[in-house]
Amino acid sequence: MFGGDNEDKIYPRMHLFYEEWTEEAADLYIKMDEEFFRLLNVLPVKKGFLPTALDYYESKDAKSLAAKLSAIQGFKGILSPMAETADGWIADYSSRYFTEDFPFGLRYIWQLAHDNHVLCPNIDMVYEWGINKINIYS
């Protein structure tokens, strides 16, 4: 949502986190999920105990996953981590989406992957981006 071409973008309005989920975001989610399952394959965990994101959300690809996430009733109305400024809306890197989910969530997956020599380029990219944003804006 806030990376890549959208880095430091000013938006005209607040976005809905799930209802405006994009195919691009879904594609990245799928790639990260595939990397997560490669990690699980080297850990001493029971195989098959956890469904893939595509299986869990009854989807077959990024397009169907984006459609599913944007239509889940329980996700309706959840706002994106954004802050209003005089010029418009910007990413709020002080939001718990960043200050909790990166250092206390994704970090452990990232660390386990590195400790077990599992290549996870998408997890690396997202984790490093988020941690850098927290460090810059905190």
State where each predicted segment sits.
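C-terminal substrate-binding/catalytic lobe of Rossmann-fold NAD(P)-dependent dehydrogenases
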Residues: 1-107, 116
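Structural helix-adjacent loops and short alpha-helical linkers that scaffold large soluble proteins
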Residues: 117-122
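Small/polar glycine-rich anion-binding or flexible loop at a beta-alpha turn
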Residues: 123-133
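Short terminal or interdomain "cap/linker" segment that borders an active site or interface and mediates
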Residues: 134-138
